[in-house]
């Protein structure tokens, strides 16, 4: 009798377990994990200067259940071209966008396209009084730090030094601020700035060579990753005395040039954190419907030299996936 009761109890327990499991399945039937699609539009997205940035995006996306689509782009001709890509991504169903604006939104084209769309800007805040959350390293401080690194390398006096500046895309407010910060840092140093060239004036190495032949300089200053790579390529091809190079960047090539002594000092923004924080800011707008208005999240940066390239702090920014 006791044995029969035992088996009956066991059977009832098994039936209850099946019923609970089935009920759970019915309640959750049709429920799907919600993913939001985010389009990321940056200049020349295949460049490895975006490697750490993309890793930060993916880290944030994993935490927020976002699907990140880094749109395949080449170098933008102008803001209108970039805006056409943004418009297409929104038409294709993007729930939000992370954008590196390639110029100022003077005519309101960009603002109009993303009106009502959760939007975060990366690296460049765009118009003079941006309407959007921006995540970037302080551009003025980056420029000033490059200038201070140059002064430190020259013993705090640049008397007798001639300088050529590759200023990058001057349609971007962030690049203009970098130039302003550098100029302020060296204005009383005794340095003679012989030329300042934007990316429109120096599109490739042959163009730089033409300027160099007319006015060679003892120091090259490059204010963004692409210009630093260009200057490094140029210096490698020079015979005889080579100029010192001070720049900004985070790509594999710039790190290689720093390690080989082609670059004297490199300012490196924390692009992993920039990507991560862009997603976190966008999540506030998409998941929690919170709009904190016009805010600016400042990303840290550091100065790397050949001597501190493999220090832990430097590696944490340059190689976040292996640190």
Question: Model-derived features: where do they sit?
Answer:
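Hydrophobic alpha-helical segments within soluble ligand-binding/sensing domains
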Residues: 134-161, 250-254, 269-287
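Hinge/cleft segment of the Venus flytrap/periplasmic-binding protein
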Residues: 273, 277-323
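Extracytoplasmic "Venus flytrap"
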Residues: 38-55, 60, 69-80, 102, ...
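Hydrophobic membrane-insertion alpha-helices, especially the h-region
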Residues: 7-24
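Structural motif
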Residues: 69-91, 194-214, 228-230
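Hydrophobic alpha-helical
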Residues: 97-115, 182, 199-255
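Flexible loop/hinge segments that line or gate small-molecule binding clefts
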Residues: 105-141, 251-259
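Short beta-strand segments enriched in small/hydrophobic residues
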Residues: 24-53, 132-133, 162-171
